[in-house]
Amino acid sequence: LSPMGLNDIPAVHPDKPEAARKAGEAVVAALKADRKPRDIITPTSLKNAAVAVTATAGSTNAVLHLLAIAREAGVSRDQFDIDVFDAVSRKTPVIADLKPGGRYMAPDMAAAGGARLLLQRLKAADMLDDAPTVTGKTLFEEADLASETVGQDVILSPDKPLKKRGG
């Protein structure tokens, strides 16, 4: 539950203090707008998270974390469980060339265009559903703000993935 792009910034990057300030402002704005975690953590947002994790060949720990977050947010097992995650991983291609299986690290993904670019690619391939975010913008509005670094080869197109499916 952080504003889009702020977690793209590496911990030791000089922009991190400004990102922390922006995160704090987002918390205050969310409180003023009465946006609560349960308004944002929904079956749709959890499925979108599973798609993003799969598209980056993310850690199996993400499965455990997303399931725990779902339960804490009151999302029932029939709305989001390990079977939903499995179904998502079977139809989501790996499009981010990230370690440990790939060539690049998270800071390289940030330099390429970050989470927004990843989501823009997944949105264009109709693999995501629009949902609210912590900022009040929708996921698709955030994805539409993506800026791709010319010549990057970290985040690929779903029609030319590293692997046809995650897993």
Regions found by a protein language model. Name each.
Residues L1-G167:
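Catalytic or ion-coupling anion/metal-binding cores of large enzyme and transporter domains
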